[in-house]
Amino acid sequence: MVRRILSVFLATALTWGVSACPSALAQSAEAGYRFSPVNQFDVKLMATYWNPIVQYVSAKSGVKLHLKIGRTSTDTTAYVLTQEVEFIFSNHLFSPEREKLGWKVFGRRNSPAIRGEIVVPADSPITELSQLKGQEVAFPGPEAFIAYKVPYAQLLNAGIDVQVVFGGNQNGALAQLFAGKVKAVGGNSQLIEGYANRERRQFRVLWRSEPYYDLALMVSGRVPEKDAQAVAQAFLGMHKDPAGMAILRQADQSVGITDPIAFVPATNADYEAYRRFYQTAPQQLR
């Protein structure tokens, strides 16, 4: 099976206000902590979405957060695995091995459940998954749970061998689709809908997974409880503050989300569907 990485992103990781050096111990609130959301969009759009939110949370909590984003979702997840960050927005840590790292869920967005999808342009001659056999199919990256692992598992289980192409994030994968370089895309239903709204594109959904909760806000066990609670309360209270709600609406609009979204409390128990996936997933995706 051919795998190739599309070089469509910046060659170096982008970090706002932080050093790239790993930290073995939790920093003080005065020094600040690193916050890494998974790359759901290109780097520029990620910054547009998250910078105002991070600035609000820092000011409201009194705990300085610095946005740290890699050029791809794989790079950003690597920051987590090497303990370079203390707060994350991710769904990449629910495999049995990664749960041992001790990250704690404290929130999520109250968006509708997300699903893995395999899509083609609305005018594509492809109408069934079986027609993808031997074709190139783009995914955001090997770490993307909803957009890669879930739909690719479906293809593997159905015996449909495709050539995997990684686009670095959802936007990159979809750009390859409309450039005619791949026949289909595996994706996150929320991100595909947002892309369709922003770019005025239409899709045909060939397959859709069971529902999963949106990505989780998580904190490392290395962060003192006082700081963890202050940051959590700032995130979870944003929608109750007119200034915070305005920032959330602006962020939603920047990525094509039409319904108002807020951060709400969540726990590790809310992500049981992710754990079930790993119990039966093809070995190469565990």
Language-model-detected regions and their locations in the chain:
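Positively charged n-region of N-terminal signal peptides that target proteins for export
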Residues: 1-4
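Bacterial N-terminal signal peptides
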Residues: 7-20
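Extracytoplasmic small-molecule ligand-binding "clamshell" domains
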Residues: 26-93
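An extracytoplasmic/periplasmic, membrane-proximal ligand-sensing/linker region
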Residues: 30-37, 41-52, 219-286
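Short helices/loops that flank or line small-molecule/ion binding pockets
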Residues: 74-87, 100-101, 130, 171-186, ...
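Hydrophobic/proline-rich hinge and linker segments of small-molecule sensing/allosteric domains
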Residues: 105-128, 216-220
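Pocket-lining segment of extracytoplasmic ligand-binding domains
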Residues: 124, 135-233
